[in-house]
Amino acid sequence: MPKQVVEVLVEGGKATPGPPLGPAIGPLGLNVKQVVDKINEATKDFAGMQVPVKIIVDPVTKQFEIEVGVPPTSQLIKKELGLEKGSGEPKHNIVGNLTMEQVIKIAKMKKDQMLALTLKAAAKEVIGTALSMGVTVEGKDPREVQKEIDEGVYDELFEKAEKE
């Protein structure tokens, strides 16, 4: 019998046997507490963030494994800036400012899950998310910073980051 995959979004380090986890894995005959403990251990570094988790279950042996994804870009931006939430009106209400170093740090975390082929392209995706959240980059409108990336203004930072 093929393995079954259950995908859930849980708060890092704070998964509980209640929804969405319990109802999703209970019918598979797993020890829910064991699964919850393993997820909490695997996601403790992402405390306070929503984290995508895959639970891969062998329905015959009841063995399972946990795969932890990287939180959504918006969650990483909020954590980096210590924000509760993004702006309800991103064009009128700015809630924070990212440095280019912070943008690159987030882009490196997310790059494997993005369609971007280069770190520059990944950084531009992060900046796009910042724009939709009401977050400026280097104190400027995120669209302006995306143009500056295309013009090579931050090339030194990208070269340094790619060597790390």
From Swiss-Prot:
GO CC entries: large ribosomal subunit
Pfam families the UniProt entry points to: Ribosomal_L11 (PF00298), Ribosomal_L11_N (PF03946)
UniProt keyword list: Ribonucleoprotein, Ribosomal protein, RNA-binding, rRNA-binding
UniProt-listed GO biological process terms: translation
NCBIfam families, sorted: PRK01143.1
PANTHER family, per database record: 60S RIBOSOMAL PROTEIN L12, LARGE RIBOSOMAL SUBUNIT PROTEIN UL11M
Record-given protein name: Large ribosomal subunit protein uL11
Keyword Cytoplasm (UniProt): no
Superkingdom classification of source: Archaea
Subunit structure comment from the entry: Part of the ribosomal stalk of the 50S ribosomal subunit. Interacts with L10 and the large rRNA to form the base of the stalk. L10 forms an elongated spine to which L12 dimers bind in a sequential fashion forming a multimeric L10(L12)X complex.
Species whose genome carries this gene: Pyrococcus furiosus (strain ATCC 43587 / DSM 3638 / JCM 8422 / Vc1)
GO molecular function: large ribosomal subunit rRNA binding; structural constituent of ribosome
Family, similarity comment: Belongs to the universal ribosomal protein uL11 family.
Function text: Forms part of the ribosomal stalk which helps the ribosome interact with GTP-bound translation factors.
Coiled coil: none
Gene: rpl11
